[in-house]
Amino acid sequence: MSGTPTGTSAAKVVIAAAMHRESECVIDTLELLGIGQDRQRVLHSDDLSVAEAVEQGAEAVAGAAGLVLCGGGDVAPRRYGEAALPWVRISIQKGRDEMEWAMLDAAREHRVPVWGICRGFQTLNVYLGGTLWQDLPTQVSNTLAHHLSSPRDALIHDVEVTPEGRGSGLGEVLARERCLVNSRHHQAIRELGDGLVPVARSADGVVEAVVLDDPDWWLEGVEWHPENLMPLPQQRAVAQRFADAVEARAGG
């Protein structure tokens, strides 16, 4: 793998999604954190052929200052060796999968910081060899309610820092005070991907935050949607960690 290219202040943050409604709040959040739209490149897989999405995604990330994988539909279960449950098939975003795998290949090669949100969090896990529960309500007993789509900023359960996560920067942010989160997912990490550290879990054991144990590649993800919770200092600090990683890379 090649080393990190020399960063410049002009390097952009790539935002990956299938469509605008998945990326709009992330665009606004990055702008709030000082990464304006002139420093963002948004790629929507639904606007491109699969070949275009793969080519443009890899090219964009290779020279990027950061990559955000937004929330959205489901990762194809075939990527972790399973057949899709019948009701999961309709929400699979195959074109987005292809684009994001190419993006992550480029990010890993060039050590581009990556932040995964909800579906993006799950994508990171599968990319690194992990698996998912395809549908928590039907596959796992006695779980919390993990899906409330509206209002987007409704805080519906706590997350708690794990013993493994206490030494991480993300763990320190989440341990500052009680951490309540919004939640709108029906899938979850089942087996962790290679190198991922479970930083936080909900009371039912569902993994809610991860970091990659690799000093040369900044990669973090959360199962909730901090981009909808920017008025809360703790949640803004979660997002700020990515912004800081972007600025460190852009500054070379």
Where would I find each of the regions flagged by the language model?
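N-terminal beta1-alpha1 cap of cysteine-dependent amidohydrolase-like domains
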Residues: M1-P113, N125-V126, W133, P137-G171, ...
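Conserved G/P- and acidic residue-centered "switch" motifs that form tight phosphate/ATP-binding loops
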Residues: C118
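The feature captures the ABC ATPase H-loop/switch
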Residues: F121
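Short, basic/aromatic beta-hairpin or loop at an interaction surface
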Residues: L174-A175
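Active-site-proximal beta-strand elements of phosphoester/diester hydrolases
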Residues: L219-W224
